[in-house]
């Protein structure tokens, strides 16, 4: 039988204060990052939707979902990491404090002369590359982006729209990253990659810190509306940079009251799940084309910076079928009339909704839901990381029933 959900409970979860250090993801860092983003063009707090009807229907205390389709006009959260990493890199280059730096200051003639030769290069399925291209565009700098085989032509065009050079390669994601790395070394470009390996850790750390803005906003939005803090946090993962960033912030913020953290990946690219199954404490890779509709999660090699955070704080690792992402997209787009706010959630953004719905509706997974303590006392926080970044694929799934 083909399982829609495979799971592995984490035997290595640590009590607060005994696991991987989180000093680079604490509240003070989060507020510094947020202050930087507030100075960027088009900054606005993204919505936090209260899915009250869905939570009642599923027998849960509450469901809130952060809608990152509104971020910087980029239709995804990734611009947070790319822009902050660009800011940190240029602050170091100019020997100034990022807290006193803004993109407006970087656009003065004196500073533009000092940074004019910077070229940023990265690999992406779309969202991260668009964020890097957008950040470079704000400063009149060049970006070069490599995309894996099978990438959406529309996503590539969106990257080129920001003035970047963009190539769809014949490589899978991890090999496209290696290509970007080689080109940076050969041409003296600046590699802005959202994953890390031995010897390349500083910039990926900055990117992870950049993602903290959405976590800080979500925490503050819950507080402002007198909503309960999450008992459950469901985070989707590719290499794990986003998941590590958001869980790191919430663990540091909530300390002994750490939520039940569930990390979900596509079956075809479930490197964190496989690492948990191996249960030796080390990150493990998956290889191949990793064909999944969740293109933003089609990554086979864990980020070595985020892995210890994920290993020490995740409650359960879940590997999910593509049909759950498709179901989440449809549920988000078409709630019952007059109930929850409809919103556009793309393939990688909607997996949390689809997973939660399946866990609470399919009797086959009732024991798993019980073990995860998903009941009337559960308050679940989800992040919709993207909107319809490839509108043709979105329409095919939501209207035509692809991956049903």
Swiss-Prot record:
KW Lyase (keyword) present: yes
Reactions accelerated catalytically: (S)-2,3-diaminopropanoate + H2O + H(+) = pyruvate + 2 NH4(+); (R)-2,3-diaminopropanoate + H2O + H(+) = pyruvate + 2 NH4(+)
Regulation: Competitively inhibited by L- and D-alanine.
Cofactor note: Binds 1 pyridoxal phosphate per subunit.
Modified residues (N6-(pyridoxal phosphate)lysine): 78
Cofactor: pyridoxal 5'-phosphate
Keywords: Lyase, Pyridoxal phosphate
Gene ablation phenotype (knockout): No growth on minimal medium plus DL-DAP; growth can be restored by a mix of 8 amino acids (Arg, Asn, Cys, Glu, Ile, Leu, Met and Thr).
Similarity comment: Belongs to the diaminopropionate ammonia-lyase family.
Protein name in UniProt: Diaminopropionate ammonia-lyase
